[in-house]
């Protein structure tokens, strides 16, 4: 069900200032004419001059043509925003599933005063009207014509090149929009005088359906949308006062995984200079699939919407041609049915290891990469797994305390860690059970939250940080531990996935929100850390050496900081015991038991063949016996 369309609100029309002729009596009264006339002309001239200066600030010429932006207010002063800038041709009709094409030049002036359409996607209807889910749902009309980006820049425009932050939204590669209120760039830009860019990219089947080897649906076109936006930044951000030689890419969840994939893809690597990965990593178990699984999901979707199955050859063209005839909402309605099994924190269409954008698996590329001199900021929130439990884990709901039974915990491990052997699942249960209180519902709830969070976010991020640091990168790490006073999710969920973003973007500074005074100060601190990192590659405050220092993360010391209302606290070992289990022990267990699993499969296959043979023999014997009895009559 698509969200209701919201009325687009454009800028107020400026009143034309009409120059009035002074009254004749003033012109003929020497004692009054000069002062009053000068005052009148000064007031009128000042108004016209101010409007002229504003027009100059809001008119920008980029390679494609001219843009008119809008002036936005913040408590600290105005910023200029250029919203809904087209950077690619609409990927509709015959362009569906294909790589993006740069936007052709236009004539006239593009109205860049309001956000444009959101890319077609699944809309969360699990808890209708609930702020915790609605804040992530599309807030503009859904369309395949959605490849637009936004630029916020200080007002007045910087006279010297200013560092640029480029945001990539999350949403499991199946949802997301740059126009969400939580991504409003005005507060960060005004407070830190950076330039901020965000872009839409295709999600779900439109961005990540893949028939490897096919030119018609090569896969990863959502990542290519992001890359094209980064190329646009290199070509055009100077017109907004931005510095194309100082671009920091930052994202959260699937956006963070995307940032990591651009780090691992040589054609993208030269388009930015620093990276921030919030609650996501390219090596997460949900972030990519292999070519075989990508093809299976694509053909399964085709089957579900009534398109003929594709093969490895020419049939792919017919399959894609059929998929292009299906309404966008029909594809969205069937996306979730292609997953191989019931699970949480798994998504239908995601980046594929295609040998092109990703020449190998993220793990292999991380292990083999040269990251000397790279500057990276990574982190997680305190309770990464809790958000996902209400989307399918047995016994969980936002509307109660989710005090689960032992049986629900065991079933939850199977959906939280899908596609592993029974032995591996049992190892997870053994590691996460509090054996002093193995039946305690609250402890079981927390344990399953940790299973999902550690497996999918915390330990992939820790692994990435350690590998990058060991290979010469300068890495900073954090755990975000503040639960917002405005959070609508229940207390048992703690600090859920995604709820640091509002502080990074300075949303507490919005006077229409009900954050505390301490949270406003906290948001200013976080914006300063992120902006410092964008400026220098170091989040620490260079102007205040007495301030608490945020040390680099190294493979040996593993130092990170806790981010909450208190001053920085330095800690060591990001979930070290749990991550040793996921990153060291479990892979060895799976490798060691691989042959056992294969032997079990072979034994079951032989047993099935033997059982089928015995059934067939019995049927033949019964048939013979009946014939023999009939011949005796």
Residue spans of the language-model regions?
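Non-catalytic accessory segments of hydrolases
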Residues: 2-12, 18-223, 244, 345, ...
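Ordered, helix-dominated protein-protein interaction surfaces in large eukaryotic regulatory proteins
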Residues: 3, 22, 71, 89, ...
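Serine-hydrolase-like catalytic core of hydrolytic proteins
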Residues: 28-46, 130-316, 325, 359-391, ...
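Alpha-helical packing segments of well-folded alpha/beta enzyme cores
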Residues: 145-148, 229, 460, 526, ...
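Short, solvent-exposed turn/loop segments enriched in Gly/Ser/Thr/Pro and often Arg
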Residues: 202-205, 250-256, 479-487, 545-554
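Substrate-gating cap/lid region and adjacent catalytic-acid/histidine neighborhood
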Residues: 283, 322-520, 529, 536, ...
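Surface-exposed patches in mature extracellular/periplasmic domains of secreted proteins
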Residues: 307-320, 334-336, 440-441, 477, ...
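C-terminal transmembrane bundle
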Residues: 498-500, 560-563
């Amino acid at each position: 069900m698509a969200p209701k369309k919201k009325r687009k609100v454009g800028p107020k029309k400026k009143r034309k200032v009409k120059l009035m002729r002074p009254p004749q009596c003033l012109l003929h009264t020497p004692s009054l004419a000069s002062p009053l006339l000068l005052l009148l002309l000064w007031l009128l001239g000042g108004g016209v001059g101010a409007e002229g200066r504003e027009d100059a600030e809001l008119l920008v010429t980029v390679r494609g043509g001219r843009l008119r932006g809008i002036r936005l207010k913040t408590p600290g002063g105005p910023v200029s925003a250029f919203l809904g800038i087209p950077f690619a041709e609409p990927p509709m009709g015959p362009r569906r599933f294909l790589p993006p094409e740069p936007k052709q030049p236009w004539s006239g002036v593009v109205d860049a005063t309001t956000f444009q359409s959101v890319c077609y996607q699944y809309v969360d209807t699990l808890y209708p009207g609930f702020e915790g889910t609605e804040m992530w749902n599309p807030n503009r009309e859904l369309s395949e014509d959605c490849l637009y980006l936004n630029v916020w820049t200080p007002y007045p425009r910087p006279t010297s090149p200013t560092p640029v932050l480029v945001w990539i939204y999350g949403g499991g590669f199946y949802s997301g929009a740059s126009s969400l209120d939580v991504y409003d760039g005005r507060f960060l830009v005004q407070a830190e005088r950076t330039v901020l860019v965000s872009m839409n990219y295709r999600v779900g089947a439109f961005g990540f359906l893949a028939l490897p080897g096919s030119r018609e649906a090569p896969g990863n076109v959502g990542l290519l949308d992001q890359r094209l936006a980064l190329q646009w930044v290199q070509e055009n951000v100077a017109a907004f006062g931005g510095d194309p030689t100082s671009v920091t890419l930052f994202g959260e969840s699937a956006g963070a995984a995307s940032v990591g994939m651009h780090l691992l893809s040589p054609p993208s690597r030269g388009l930015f200079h620093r990276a921030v990965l919030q609650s996501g990593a390219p090596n997460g178990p949900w972030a990519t699939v292999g070519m075989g699984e990508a093809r299976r999901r694509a053909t399964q979707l085709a089957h579900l919407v009534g398109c003929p199955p594709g093969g490895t050859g020419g049939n792919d063209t017919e399959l894609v041609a059929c998929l292009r005839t299906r309404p966008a909402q029909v594809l969205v309605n069937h996306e979730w049915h292609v997953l191989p099994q019931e699970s949480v924190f798994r998504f239908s269409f995601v980046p594929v290891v295609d040998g092109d954008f990703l020449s190998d698996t993220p793990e292999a590329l991380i292990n083999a990469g040269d990251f000397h001199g790279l500057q990276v900021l990574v982190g997680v929130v305190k309770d990464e797994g809790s958000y996902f439990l209400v989307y399918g884990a047995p016994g969980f709901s936002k509307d109660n305390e989710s005090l689960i039974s032992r049986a629900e915990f065991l079933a939850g491990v199977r959906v939280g860690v899908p596609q592993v052997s029974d032995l591996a699942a049992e190892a997870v249960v053994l590691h996460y059970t509090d054996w002093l209180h193995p039946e305690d519902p609250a402890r079981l709830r927390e344990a399953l939250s940790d299973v999902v969070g550690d497996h999918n976010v915390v330990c992939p991020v820790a692994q990435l940080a350690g590998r990058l640091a060991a290979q010469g990168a300068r890495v900073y790490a954090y755990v975000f531990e503040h639960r917002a006073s405005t959070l609508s999710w229940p207390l048992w969920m703690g600090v859920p996935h995604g709820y640091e973003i509002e502080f990074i973007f300075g949303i507490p500074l919005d006077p229409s929100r009900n954050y505390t005074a301490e949270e406003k100060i906290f948001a200013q601190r976080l914006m300063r850390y992120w902006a410092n990192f964008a400026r220098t590659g170091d989040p620490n405050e260079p102007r205040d050496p007495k301030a608490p220092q945020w040390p680099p993360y190294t493979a040996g010391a593993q130092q990170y900081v806790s981010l909450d209302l208190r001053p920085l606290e330095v800690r060591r070992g990001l979930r070290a015991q749990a991550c040793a289990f996921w990153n060291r022990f479990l892979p060895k267990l799976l490798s060691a038991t691989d042959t056992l699993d294969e032997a079990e499969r072979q034994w079951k296959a032989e047993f099935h063949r033997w059982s089928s043979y015995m059934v067939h023999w019995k049927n033949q014997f019964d048939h013979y016996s009946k014939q023999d009895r009939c011949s005796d009559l």
